[in-house]
Amino acid sequence: MIDEQRFLELESIVKNMVKVGIVESFNQNNATARVVFEDANLKSYDLPIMVKQTKDNKDYWVPDIDEPVICIFLPTGIESGFILGAYYNQKDKPPVIDQNKRTVKFKDGTIIEYDRKQHKLTADVKGDIDIKATGKIDINASGAMNIHSDTSINITAPKIDLN
């Protein structure tokens, strides 16, 4: 039978394995952040931020300062842990409420969205778009294609075919 002291130690470890906090600072060189846990009046060490991939394909996402995050810690304490990610709350709500849409909304108002029900990709960019390819670029549409500019359209190539 487990004695009361060991039970209390185990309970303390489990209670401190998952914590909710606010990002206080970000270390760009290491892609780590420090988190403040107001419920315990504690501050973490620099914590790695969980991402989808880091080896051959790389995914980069970092939380903003003052963003609420969920952290998980190893049983050794808040010296060793990870930021799992951010979460929506009453202050910071989702950009859309539709299970058929995958949406990324940036601070400047730029939105990139895919609607799987409508089969439509939308990019509403509040700035320039730069597309580069080391190979060819094909744009095909089974419907009409429209190109509009409020100023000018420049096409530069050794050969231009219009049919």
Tell me the role of every PLM-derived stretch.
Residues 1-117:
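Exposed beta-strand/loop interface patches that mediate assembly or binding
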Residues 1-5, 9, 20-22, 132-163:
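Intrinsic-disorder/coil detector with helix-boundary
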Residues 32-34, 82, 122, 130, ...:
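General beta-strand recognition
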Residues 37-39, 87, 127, 135, ...:
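A short beta-strand motif that forms part of the nucleic acid-binding face
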Residues 38-40, 107-108, 126, 156-158, ...:
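Short strand-coil-strand connectors
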Residues 43-44, 53-54, 79, 92, ...:
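A short local loop/turn or secondary-structure capping micro-motif enriched for an aromatic residue
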Residues 45-47, 82, 94-96, 124-125, ...:
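A short, polar/proline- and glycine-enriched secondary-structure boundary/capping micro-motif
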Residues 73, 78, 116-118, 125-126, ...:
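Trimeric beta-solenoid/beta-helix "fiber body" segments of extracellular/virion adhesins
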